[in-house]
Structures are given as structure tokens and as C-alpha cells.
Amino acid sequence: MFETTQVLFAFNSNHMEGSTLSVEQTSDLYTTGSMSPADGMDAIRLDDAIETRNHFHAFNWMLDRVDRPVDDAMICSMHAILKRGTSQEQDPDNNVGAYKARPNVIGGLLQEHTVLAADVPAAMREVIAAHRELKDDPFSIAFAHWLFETTHPFFDGNGRVGRLLLFKELLRIDAMPMVIQDRNRGLYVRGLREFGRTPGYLIDTLLAERDVYRGIVETMAPDRTSYTYHDAWDGVVARRIENPYLKHAWDELDIFGACGDGAVPGPPMRGDVRGRA
């Protein structure tokens, strides 16, 4: 059960972000620490292999802390583990293990704007509160995940960190978690894009993925797990759905900063990656 989750989670979450590794290669990397090029594949991108291995470590690290309240340091630590040893870690402008210092967009969401770097610390207080207050309720789960992804606190790796975080928080409240599948990426991206107007797209996608993972759990560990799974919601959202720190239009000051160099005042929040990683 554990190995299956590790392989499926690492394969799907990385593949959604452009990894070229197959599920078989992901499995080989997990079980043997090595892999071979697939038929017709001339080369393996080093970062793909490193980030897959790092996802295994991040999942273990997360499980060791599953009952701890989420905070900035925990989230930044997961990012640091995911990006450790990659080419991106070598560029200080990328702020690996820290919140972003420059504006970025969500490419998969038709270049939609995200929260500006200067506003990320405040926005993350809202994100963290939504996860700490998470209930086994379809809207609550989808809202917390959407809030993280629209904040997009890191230069890269936001989807993977957000999905790890959601898995952790569902385990913390003893609710059925999920592994979002790459084959459903289109539905998932549409759900994130439309959530503010039509939350049902994302809610239904996440419920379907929880159904799939529940089937895996019941097949591989029947009668050995205890969890909640509430799949009903009334389709009526009483409050406005918004990320209060998200600006849908940027000006030059937003993009380039007061000094014209994109710098963001203040030290970045960095994660503590001590312990098993």
C-alpha cells in the first residue's frame, strides 16, 4: 500500500508538471534507486529523476509530521526537499525553500496571475488557516487547495507542494486522501480555473480522485484502515469565493518593484529541513 502510494503519487504529480518518466521508471527508481530509458527515449532529464526521488523523500518527511499543525516553515521545507539537487536550486533567484521574490503566472491556467511576491506572506496566513480548519467536506477541501494554488507562493513546484499538503491535511483529520491523476489533468486545471465562479468542477474532480484512491485502499488494505469520507454537498455556496490577495491586473510597480529590479523587501521565509529528508 505504501509503495503503491509512493509510486502513483510521485509519477502523477511530477508528470502533471512535465516530467518525462513513465510509471514503470518511477517504480524502478523507488524500488532499486536506478532506472533505464524507455523504448524510444534517447535520454532521461536529470532533473526529472532527481525530482521524482525527492518526491519520495518529501512524502516520507510529510508523513513523519502528519499530525503537526501546518505552518510556513513546514511548507517551505517541503519545497526545499522537492527541489534539492536540481538545476533550479543553483540559481539564487529561484529562492528554493523560500517564498518567491518575483511575480509569476500559472502556465497551465492560461497564464493566469497569482498573488504578488510582496503579498505572499499575508496570503499564506489565509492558506494555512484554511488547511488548519479543514473538514471532511467537499467544498472545504477544494477551497483550501484552490487558495494555495492561486497564491502560488513559490517560483516553481507549487502544484506538487499543494498536493502533498492536501494529502497531509486529509490524513491529519482521518479523512480519505487522494492522488490526482495526470490523465485527469485537464479536468483538474479547469476546476482550479473555474472554482471562483463554478466550484463544482473542482469539487467533483477531487471527489472522483478520492473514490479512486479509496478503491485502492479497500483492495490492498481491506478492513485495516479507518477513515471518513463525506461526498455530499448542496451545491450552494453562501459566501463569495475569492483569494483576497490576488490581483487580476498588474502594473509596472507590481512587476519590477520600487527599485525597478524586481526585488522584494525583507528576508524570505525559509524552511527548516533538518531531520529525515
Where do the PLM segments sit?
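FIC/Doc superfamily catalytic core
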Residues: 1-156, 160-277
